[in-house]
Amino acid sequence: MAIDRRRFLQLCAGAGALGLTPGRAAAYTPSPKLPIIDVHLHAYPADEALPTTPNPINGKSSVPKDGEGHLRACLAEMKRLNVVKGVVSGGSGDRLAAAAHWREAAPDRIIAGAGVRGSEDTPLPELGVLRNELAAGRLRVLGEVTAQYAGLSLSDPKYEPYLALAEELDVPVALHTGTGPPGISFDPCCRHFRASLGNPALVEEALNRHPKLRLNIMHGGWPYLEETISMLFHYPQVYTDLGAIDWLLPRAEFHAYLAALMRPGFGKRIMLGTDQMFWPDAIGIAVEGADSARFLTSSEKRDIFHGNAARFFRLGTG
């Protein structure tokens, strides 16, 4: 959910704004401690001052003072939870540089992605620069692509050369889908945002133009359940992550949505993502959200926590 984070905080920092249930305050450690790949993390420029708004779920003032402190706190939380790999994209400022800084700080743990949008205030990166970074392996994912916040879908011609590049280099794409903060389209940052543009079905033309493209539908496509199921059913190269919905939604709603994705047999295509934004402790809340789903077998949890992402990102295991 890579948007104007400060505006996100203004819009829905209070738990009531999203119908959330505060109070999940205890530090969480999964038991047994399964290896985890978090496919949805965000980085901020090292010298960027971060807001002090409490975590909207547990009420804790857990935001580090700047991007560098945020990096260190997130890496510590990843180590504590046995998050062996994390896919990170920039959330503000120079997004490519922010992700690269994380990779340089923990090259064995971090996979850097190219956070891109395509709006007037956040233009797409120069294609040649992106090609060089992807070809060299310094960036390994095209995403998070926040087309919805630019008033576009992934099938818009603006993204065509970038998708062609990803297909050519066999680089996976991670697309923001689903929802955004309440009232976001009224804010100057995101006047072109439309809820309807979060519909995962809008990727269909792009997928047919690029049949070899691997695509992660981020945020589980919530609340577009039927459309997400349709894309997973018709396009075997499509996976989905649970970022943000596994800690910001009420637990009962998240579990119901996850169960609905599991019932048609997509347990091998769902990946753990957190979308921690400013709050390092959100990583643990998100992991707990998936781990506490009692309808999941231990094998299904291993797939969601690690195996599916290892396969999607071609990490050599899973």
Segments (PLM) and residue ranges:
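Active-site-proximal beta-strand/loop segments in catalytic clefts of secreted hydrolases
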Residues: 39-42, 89-91, 115-117, 144-147, ...
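Short, surface-exposed amphipathic charged segments that create phosphate/polyanion-binding patches used
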Residues: 124-132, 255-257, 316-318
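Mid-domain alpha/beta scaffold segments of enzyme catalytic cores
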Residues: 22-23, 28-153, 157-160, 165, ...
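Non-transmembrane alpha-helical segments in soluble domains
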Residues: 9, 75, 87, 100, ...
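Catalytic pocket-lining loop regions of alpha/beta-barrel enzymes
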Residues: 29, 103, 108-110, 140-141, ...
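Active-site environment of divalent metal-dependent phosphoester hydrolases
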Residues: 44-46, 93-96, 119, 148-150, ...
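Mid-to-C-terminal alpha-helical segments outside catalytic/metal-binding sites
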Residues: 2-20, 26-39, 48-49, 55-85, ...
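A structural signal for well-ordered alpha-helical scaffolds and beta->alpha junctions
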Residues: 71, 123, 159, 196-200, ...
